[in-house]
């Protein structure tokens, strides 16, 4: 493994704006202090195994259209913007987390990502987890357990360490505490009116994926929850009482927080629940740190995440309806990134389930550009007006 001091800054470093330069220096300093860094992209990545290896896990940059022209020098244009953006940031050396990571952990969720990871491996060492397409058959669950075991072995060999069960249990306890704090923050939105702007909530959760220190980020969340709860109890109401309560479901919202989330909230709505990779459906499941086979407990927890890449995927619709009830939802907006075939096809079942429960539903198919902003604002404003 190369020493970080032997690695120069990106060739285009002097062209970066000050914010990006500062981010690169922060990550470079972190690595030069002897710390380990692993990049990942998907919520199926078993982070406790990375934690137990003494490495920080950070999400790869992949939520901007800035680098998509670079990506399209290699990738086809008619591909999901998240995939193109992730590869474009690596290809152009504009993401500090990709650039300075020791390794990237990929996964075979969708066809586009798993083939992109093969190309990414030419730029940065990439270990790919083979995620099964379902979880109802015994061999699928057993196969995923084997993938988690292989990841553990990969990290042990790469870093020259041994990951013990005690290491895994300690990592589980830290992640459980983080998820408990996330769930407390989500729960504040069940208040009527909601305790905070949904855009603020989404940005808070998104920022956590770039944090090197789990415990520090957890403490920040706990403190923010306490302050929000105290302010709400004191009578502060940052959200209008008549704001229409919207649940966002579908693809990862990181690249469309402003495009969809802010548009909802500037047209008389408030995002009270995120039913995506960074939302409650991913944070809700805890792991028993006292499980006899702690690695299997970790593997089972991640395989139970509901995502459209799984078939069948009835649990996703059931969970969405449960969240609609919990958060007193007035309407559901499904965000589908262009060329995301699994969420796009599954949206028909989601619409049927949501409207069958008497809740209005709207699907928005979009990308990371601003070309359709006018159309999206018109559609969202009209949708909220009907609620």
Describe the role of every protein-language-model region.
Residues 101, 324, 328-333:
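Proline-aspartate-enriched helix->loop->beta-strand connector
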Residues 41, 247-249, 335:
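Short hydrophobic segments within beta-strands
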Residues 2-36, 149, 153-271, 275-286:
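A charged, amphipathic alpha-helical module
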Residues 2-3, 348-387:
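Peripheral docking tails and interdomain loops at the edges
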Residues 37-91, 102, 109, 116-117:
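An N-terminal, globular interaction/scaffold subdomain
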Residues 88-156:
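Acidic/His-rich segments in extracytoplasmic proteins that coordinate ligands and/or metal ions
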Residues 32, 49-63, 70-71, 251-312, ...:
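Redox- and metal-dependent alpha/beta enzyme cores, enriched for Fe-S-associated oxidoreductases
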Residues 90, 311-328, 345-346:
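A short, acidic, amphipathic alpha-helical segment used as a generic capping/interface helix at domain edges
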